């Protein structure tokens, strides 16, 4: 929140941002351990206010970081904080929570999975599959409504699950599970069955996310 204040002070008085990623799914469903923080902002200019190379407030937090055009990753001893440029894909895509006495826009499970699949579905991680499987089970209707964002990289996603199984399996088994402990093959089968429900035409209609 200190860095959000930097955006508020030096950039936009009331910046729009959302809290998402695997840690939010952990807070919602207690499925696996996750310590990393994912903050999504629609304006790429906001990254400058959280970049230790530019911002004293950010450099006071850490000098270990990565910067790219679309995100800034802050590396801390207890985890990472990613500031990522992305608009919400679903509507509204968040719920209002109070965290540390502050109102926070916390992404819905469907929005989290939609972002994962839209932005990096062509390079899935074991945790991405794990999270997808959870949300398919817990919120199938919400995920169905977000289907157009799930199938942009569907063929590549499913091919990698099959062809890179030997690489992904040990990483999947290393996930620190909490209240959800399916097998890799179960999750891969569930993801395949779910994603195959959507016609290819849905992907063709959606060449880019809504502005």
Question: Where is each model-derived feature located?
Answer:
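Compositionally biased terminal segments of proteins
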Residues: 1-211
